[in-house]
């Protein structure tokens, strides 16, 4: 039998242990903030687009845990073609853990590092270059209105908070240009322009959150 002097601390610890279950089972485990990548315009930075039909809903859901996604080829009058993929998921690791392995399979990409694009705040972009001599891929991660520079560290720091709050979607913005010269400064590429304007248009959406 528990001594009366320990009863209150024990009750407190039991309530604390049950809180995550209560939150996720009864109040909903996911928070829909009302945003969608579907609102990203089909024309960006002077490029018009058409759907990229290679990847299907089930493939994207399986690989990236997303049911809200787009994939388009943006073209301009000079013949440039930029592929944009954007997706939202509550499974953060599926988005941040080498997204290029699925989206640019077989391209033999090497990580170049993080490039900061101008903005308020600046946008950290993970840049990858093809070892073939041409081709640039790049992606940005966004969570709760903040850009993620170190996704692993971010998830570790966020792990405790997630026990007591409903999960909020992370957004991946991914661009690929298979013909960009290897020596191009990423900041001056069309890929950077497409990426920046896609993010700006997404962030401009008003939100009305709902717990699921």
At which residue positions do the language-model features occur?
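Membrane-embedded transmembrane-helix bundle of lipid-linked glycan/lipid transferases
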Residues: 1-3
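A short, solvent-exposed beta-edge/loop patch
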Residues: 5-26, 114-212
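General structural signal for secondary-structure boundaries
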Residues: 13, 18, 32-34, 53-57
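Alpha-helical transmembrane signal-anchor/signal-peptide segments
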Residues: 26-46
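Generic detector of ordered secondary-structure context
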Residues: 39-40, 66, 165
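Hydrophobic/aromatic-rich, well-ordered segments within soluble, folded domains that form packed cores
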Residues: 41, 48-50, 175
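Short, solvent-exposed recognition patches
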Residues: 48-161
């Amino acid at each position: 039998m528990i001594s009366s002097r320990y009863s209150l601390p024990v009750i407190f610890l039991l309530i604390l242990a049950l809180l995550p279950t209560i939150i996720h089972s009864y109040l909903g485990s996911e928070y829909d903030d009302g945003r969608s990548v579907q609102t990203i315009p089909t024309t960006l930075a002077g490029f018009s687009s058409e759907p990229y039909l290679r990847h299907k809903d089930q493939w994207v859901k399986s690989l990236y845990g997303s049911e809200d996604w787009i994939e388009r080829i943006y073209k301009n009058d000079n013949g440039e073609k930029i592929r944009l993929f954007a997706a939202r998921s509550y499974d953060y690791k599926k988005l941040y853990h080498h997204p290029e392995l699925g989206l640019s399979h077989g391209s033999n990409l090497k990580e170049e590092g993080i490039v900061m694009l101008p903005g308020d705040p600046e946008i950290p972009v993970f840049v990858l270059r093809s070892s073939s001599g041409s081709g640039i891929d790049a992606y940005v991660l966004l969570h709760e209105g903040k850009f993620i520079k170190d996704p692993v560290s971010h998830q570790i720091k966020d792990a405790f908070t997630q026990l007591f709050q409903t999960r909020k979607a992370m957004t991946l913005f991914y661009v690929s240009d298979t013909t960009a010269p290897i020596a191009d400064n990423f900041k001056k590429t069309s890929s950077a322009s497409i990426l920046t304007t896609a993010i700006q248009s997404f962030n401009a959406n008003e939100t009305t959150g709902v717990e699921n």
